[in-house]
Amino acid sequence: MKSFMHSKAVIFSFTMAFFLILAACSGKNEADSKDTGWEQIKDKGKIVVATSGTLYPTSYHDTDSGSDKLTGYEVEVVREAAKRLGLKVEFKEMGIDGMLTAVNSGQVDAAANDIDVTKDREEKFAFSTPYKYSYGTAIVRKDDLSGIKTLKDLKGKKAAGAATTVYMEVARKYGAKEVIYDNATNEQYLKDVANGRTDVILNDYYLQTLALAAFPDLNITIHPDIKYMPNKQALVMKKSNAALQKKMNEALKEMSKDGSLTKLSKQFFNKADVSKKIDADVQDVDL
């Protein structure tokens, strides 16, 4: 009996030890999985970031200099933030509609392309501290404003854009016909409005203002009476990658404090400081 009891005690002790080891390993793996994104990036010394390369002035190729270098406000913000974290940046160019999928699948570590921070997206992704604040405007034909007076007049109008942007959500909400482009240039978007292939482009105020200035001969303008949806843009990362989010926020905080964000903004946005919140009378849109 004594031997039997002793055997049971040994088996019980072994079983408990086995489960304790399993629990410890499980806990370690859980902790590791939470940090694995940042640790892998740090070990490689490189962060992979999705961007379009076609969205002036936030992500574009500088053909004027003859170098065709990828640059722009967000491109340089990411480069500087990464530099402060001891990292190099590899940019992967793709259409905006594929960026969030690429982040979730792990194809890239982050995406930077004037991506709006929304409540719905915050439930699915991690965002950095915003580095750009703006609001929505509408590019229309100059001679007749494309027959649009208010957002309600979008019904039946042909709205140009990418399918997954918040601006296409606005167009959808007001009954516009969607004309979807895949990583098109500003020139293509603007010429299509001017020649009547489309009627309106809903997008960010700063981006539209600069895009318009680049093509002064086209029959297009920013609608004088339509200002809507105050918004903010940030770097988007996988929801589980809290460590990377924290590191990026630390770098961006430093850049805001020492004036680097303001300097980059003024360089790319015609001396405007997009890193500061806007004080303007802007219509809210509930999406």
From Swiss-Prot:
Gene3D superfamilies recorded: Periplasmic binding protein-like II
InterPro entries per record: SBP_3_CS (IPR018313), Solute-binding_3/MltF_N (IPR001638)
GO terms for cellular component: plasma membrane
Keyword Nucleotide-binding found: no
This protein's UniProt keywords: Cell membrane, Lipoprotein, Membrane, Palmitate, Signal, Transport
Family indicated by similarity: Belongs to the bacterial solute-binding protein 3 family.
Designated name of the protein: Probable ABC transporter extracellular-binding protein YckB
Species this protein is from: Bacillus subtilis (strain 168)
Gene that encodes the chain: yckB
